[in-house]
């Protein structure tokens, strides 16, 4: 992930260390031990490799972020693979700038998901794609509690997160189209933050 204080620097979450081969094609990673998904399942190199393979196999629009490195449905299981509980390697088709590869691995399409959980929700060979549209299988500091299209997204603290725990236990994003309604929610204390308020609303709130 990006360092908020210094966006040009990447900060590892799942990875403990990594190295690039002399020919610039093989990226080897060692994972942090003891990681868990929000479900409580252990996060292993198998999950990481499978998540990246899954993105290529599904071949949805964002997959080009990974397939630009020569991965295809035919070769991805050989080019991206785990070599133990905490080790995996990624082999590209030719040398690329490590910064490019690492930045692409921070993209949403390269997000690591819980293989065991996602496959238990698979329908019709979709690798859990339909289920993940409205559910969560990650390992970040917050987890999805509820999602209703054009209505609400509710997140809550993931107590299985390896790093510093979130200082807030829950965050709720509500889809409120009218600026006047947003202003009313702020005034009543039903919302802490609003966006797209009109100048009139802002002036009223400032009084």
Predicted regions and their residues:
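Sec-exported extracytoplasmic/periplasmic mature domains
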Residues: 1-4, 36, 53-60, 95, ...
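N-terminal lobe/hinge region of extracytoplasmic solute-binding protein
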Residues: 1-22, 53, 60, 134-141
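Extracytoplasmic/secreted proteins, especially bacterial periplasmic and envelope-associated proteins
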Residues: 9, 13, 30, 43, ...
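Short, well-ordered beta-strand elements
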Residues: 16, 26-28, 48-52, 87-90, ...
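Ligand-site clamp/hinge motif
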Residues: 130, 158-204
């Amino acid at each position: 992930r990006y360092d908020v204080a210094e966006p040009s620097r990447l900060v590892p979450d799942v990875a403990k260390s990594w190295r690039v081969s002399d020919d610039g094609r093989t990226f080897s990673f060692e994972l942090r031990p003891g990681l868990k998904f929000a479900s409580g399942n252990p996060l292993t190199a198998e999950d990481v490799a499978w998540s990246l393979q899954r993105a290529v196999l599904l071949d949805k629009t964002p997959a080009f972020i990974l397939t630009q490195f020569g991965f295809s449905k035919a070769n991805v299981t050989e080019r991206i693979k785990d070599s133990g509980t905490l080790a995996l390697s990624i082999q590209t088709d030719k040398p690329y700038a490590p910064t490019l590869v690492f930045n692409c691995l921070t993209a949403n399409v390269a997000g690591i998901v819980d293989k065991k959980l996602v496959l238990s929700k698979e329908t019709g060979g979709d690798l859990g794609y339909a289920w993940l549209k409205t559910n969560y299988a990650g390992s970040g500091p917050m987890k999805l509690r509820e999602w209703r299209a054009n209505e609400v997204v509710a997140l809550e603290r993931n107590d299985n997160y390896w790093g510093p725990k979130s200082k807030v236990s829950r965050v709720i994003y509500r889809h409120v189209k009218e600026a006047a309604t947003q202003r009313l929610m702020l005034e009543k204390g039903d919302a802490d933050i609003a966006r797209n308020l009109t100048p009139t609303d802002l002036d009223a709130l400032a009084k």
